[in-house]
Amino acid sequence: MKKIFLIPTAIVTALSFVLISCADTSATSSGEMVISQDSLVKRGKYLVNIIGCDDCHSPKIFTDHGFEIDMEHRFSGHLANSPMGRANTSVMKDGYILFANDLTSAVGPWGQSYSANISSDETGIGSWTEEQFFRAIREGKSKGLKEGRPLLPPMPWFIYKNMSDPDLKAIFAYLKTSKPVENRVPGPKSLQELK
């Protein structure tokens, strides 16, 4: 009689193990949730919009309602052919910094910096690896290169470095799907070059 109960119990137990091991779970063995590429990109789009990447990395068009993002050049950074007036560095004595009228360039005690092209073009982050993106944000390295110069103000990388790995992955995934905008942003200028 005991054998009659043991055989079905063994079969049910074995089948349970097979079903559990073959089941499609939404988490990896490390416990991370698996997310589709589409969901990752959507999350990245949301994050890019709420943290204000467009504020500095997208040129603006002035309208009768104020300025709007120039969608033709979205994420292109400071346009290489944008005319720039001479910066009045004397106002920095009073503790001020200066911004270009489209917010893609700033002048301060560090000199003049230009917002980077973060579009998917090769002149932007098109050829970057995820590792480079993480290094740029986490370590404040230009172009995410180990030997790169430090990112300059006003880029708040020291705040963004606290974002989670999944959030940075999502932002990178979204930016890699953005419209490629060819634009070689000028290099920074020292304060001495501005005088």
Q: Where are each of the predicted segments found?
A:
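Electrostatic cytochrome c docking/interface patches
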Residues: 28-49, 61-65, 84-86
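Bacterial N-terminal signal peptides that target proteins for export
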Residues: 1-11
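Bacterial signal peptide processing site
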Residues: 23-25
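Electron-transfer interface patches adjacent to heme c in soluble/periplasmic c-type cytochromes
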Residues: 73-134, 158-168
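The canonical Cys-X-X-Cys-His
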Residues: 44, 50-60, 133, 171, ...
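C-terminal motif of bacterial Sec signal peptides marking the signal peptidase cleavage site
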Residues: 18-21
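Extended, well-folded interaction surfaces typified by the phenylalanyl-tRNA synthetase beta subunit core
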Residues: 184-187
